[in-house]
A protein has these predicted regions:
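An N-terminal assembly and electron-transfer interface module characteristic of large anaerobic redox
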Residues: 1-149
Length: 149
């Protein structure tokens, strides 16, 4: 927790060029394509070389999405109560470890805290059902809607 505070504080005091304005470009897609340079043809390096600030979704949302799908399966399909319980426990575990980082990011001058999964779900549900689970289903829609705001 202290390390998170120190790192966030250190980034907050790094000098920035006042005249440097970069267009922000969000990358969305399947998890492998978003994060693996070979799978995405080095898109991050290419965009940065072209002067863009690349915004990648945080990976934790993918794990929360996968866990939450067990709850959707129970509600809409034929999911098991055992998987729902495991899903909720796993999500609480992830949120517990993400909380100190979120607090530090909220206090930061330059960073934004992570949105709760419920906010991503609400964004997605404006366009489709969370029952869309193929690939990364509704999470892709939520990521696109988030970047569009």
């Amino acid at each position: 927790e202290q390390t998170i505070k120190r790192v966030t504080a250190a980034f907050d005091v790094l000098p920035l060029g006042d005249n440097v304005r970069k267009p922000k470009v969000g990358i969305v897609g399947e998890i492998l394509v978003k994060y693996h340079p070979v799978a995405n043809n080095n898109i991050v390096s290419y965009l940065e070389a072209e002067g863009a600030e690349v915004i990648l979704p945080n990976m934790m949302d993918f794990f929360l999405y996968a866990a939450y799908d067990e709850q959707v399966k129970r509600r809409l399909l034929d999911g098991t109560l055992g998987n729902v319980i495991k899903s909720k426990l796993f999500m609480k575990f992830l949120d517990y470890y993400r909380k100190p980082l979120n607090i530090a990011l909220q206090k930061s001058k330059r960073f934004s805290a992570y949105e709760p999964l419920s906010a991503l779900i609400a964004l997605a549900e404006k366009h489709l059902s969370t029952g869309n689970m193929a690939g990364e289903g509704w999470l892709l829609t939520a990521e696109m809607a988030k970047r569009h705001r």
